[in-house]
């Protein structure tokens, strides 16, 4: 038996805003300096850049990056640069990624998510901060592992029920 093909409804802009705000609030939780804590804003931003590149672009990525920099008390622009580059990469390859299965998508977005961790890492090193260790980059791999779950959860409101009605023209 083959998997059903879902026809997605148009995305509600309020749902996009809600999901980005929820991801931002998850990043605000006091996780501490534990390695492997995912950057939820980067994950949700990457998802919407791939699925709705005309609604969520590099401007939103830059603004969210500035908010993350203010929250983390980092050099202003670290996350803004990382999120903008992540958004640019996602918008560039979004058509190819949408044709892949979720498992393959996970490996396709992994370099972008790890790259989004490398940018602030390199900026901090260039500004003279001590080397935080390679565990800092683990969160990019954790985000890639969360990609299938994030895709399923964020697409749920758009899915139409599979209805075996043979009299329907579409």
Predicted regions located by residue number:
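Terminal, non-globular segments
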Residues: 1-170
């Amino acid at each position: 038996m083959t998997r059903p093909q879902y026809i997605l409804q148009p995305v509600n802009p309020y749902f996009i805003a809600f999901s980005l705000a929820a991801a931002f609030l998850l990043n605000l939780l006091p996780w501490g300096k534990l390695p492997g804590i995912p950057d939820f804003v980067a994950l949700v931003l990457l998802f919407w850049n791939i699925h709705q590149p005309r609604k969520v672009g590099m401007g939103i990525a830059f603004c969210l990056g500035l908010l993350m920099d203010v929250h983390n008390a980092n050099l202003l622009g670290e996350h803004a640069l990382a999120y903008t580059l992540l958004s640019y990469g996602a918008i560039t390859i979004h058509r190819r990624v949408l044709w892949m299965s979720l498992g393959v998508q996970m490996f396709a977005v992994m370099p972008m998510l790890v790259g989004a961790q490398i940018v602030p890492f390199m900026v901090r090193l260039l500004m003279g901060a001590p080397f935080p260790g390679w565990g800092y980059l683990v969160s990019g791999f954790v985000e890639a592992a969360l990609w299938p779950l994030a895709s399923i959860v964020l697409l749920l409101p758009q899915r139409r029920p599979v209805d075996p009605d043979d009299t329907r023209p579409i």
